[in-house]
Amino acid sequence: MITFQNVNKHYGDFHVLKQINLQIEKGEVVVIIGPSGSGKSTLLRCINRLESINEGVLTVNGTAINDRKTDINQVRQNIGMVFQHFHLYPHKTVLQNIMLAPVKVLRQSPEQAKETARYYLEKVGIPDKADAYPSQLSGGQQQRVAIARGLAMKPEVMLFDEPTSALDPEMIGEVLDVMKTLAKEGMTMVVVTHEMGFAKEVADRIVFIDEGKILEEAVPAEFYANPKEERARLFLSRILNH
């Protein structure tokens, strides 16, 4: 479904992603972990061309993302993204935030979009917040609205870029619970996170990246019990003993 072939990304002289080769299948939950500044968020953001690549080929459902002829807006309709900071419109209600893209992009009628928005608010556990404004919500609730907004476009894949790192500790669980439900329902998910418990429980595969390179890929049980790379062992010992 998503394929990186010899992908490289530079910021000027800084080589951010180095020869990335990665295949993500439909229905798979892939968690990308690694130290800060390792390139994991950049890798994620290349999937919907929020970041462009300099070399190599990146395809989503057979469409080359980096081809100039590709209609990236068409591709993005099938890719939901949830950011660290929620990016909700402060002057629109929760319902209006979720309805916006289905009406503008999918050309749904307002009635249909409203029904879709209410359905996904129910799914993320906050149906009673439809008429609230973002400022009236906790961080966890805002992030759940952001997830509902992504789902309302009925994407084929959801990207999560450190979705819990801006949240207070007691709100992290409510967001992870929603993500666990999505994973169980078969949503293709690519997640950048420091939530090791979530990765262990939900991931089909863990990808460890450091200094722009994929150093290790493994199923969680194997990765946690016996990481092959010394750098991965060091990272895990620091994170798990923190």
From Swiss-Prot:
Q: Which Pfam families match?
A: ABC_tran
In alphabetical order, the GO MF annotations are: ABC-type amino acid transporter activity; ATP binding; ATP hydrolysis activity
Membrane topology according to the record: Peripheral membrane protein
- Compartment list: Cell membrane
Keyword annotations from UniProtKB, A to Z = Amino-acid transport, ATP-binding, Cell membrane, Membrane, Nucleotide-binding, Translocase, Transport
InterPro entries, alphabetized: AAA+_ATPase, ABC_ATPase_HisP-typ, ABC_transporter-like_ATP-bd, ABC_transporter-like_CS, MetN_ABC_transporter-like, P-loop_NTPase
Please provide, in alphabetical order, the Gene Ontology terms of the cellular component aspect for this entry: plasma membrane
EC number(s) in its UniProt entry? 7.4.2.-
Report the coiled-coil segments. none
| Residues annotated as domain ABC transporter | 2-236
Highest taxon above the source species = Bacteria
Q: What are the binding positions for ATP in this chain? A: 34-41
Q: What induces it?
A: Positively regulated by TnrA under nitrogen-limited conditions.
The top EC class is: translocase
Asked if the Swiss-Prot or TrEMBL record annotates the protein with the keyword DNA repair, the reply is no
Report the PROSITE patterns cross-referenced here. Answer: ABC_TRANSPORTER_1, ABC_TRANSPORTER_2
Q: How does it assemble?
A: The complex is composed of two ATP-binding proteins (GlnQ), two transmembrane proteins (GlnM and GlnP) and a solute-binding protein (GlnH).
Function, as annotated: Part of the ABC transporter complex GlnHMPQ involved in glutamine transport. Probably responsible for energy coupling to the transport system.
Q: Which family does it belong to?
A: Belongs to the ABC transporter superfamily.
State what protein this is by name: Glutamine transport ATP-binding protein GlnQ
Q: Which organism is it from?
A: Bacillus subtilis (strain 168)
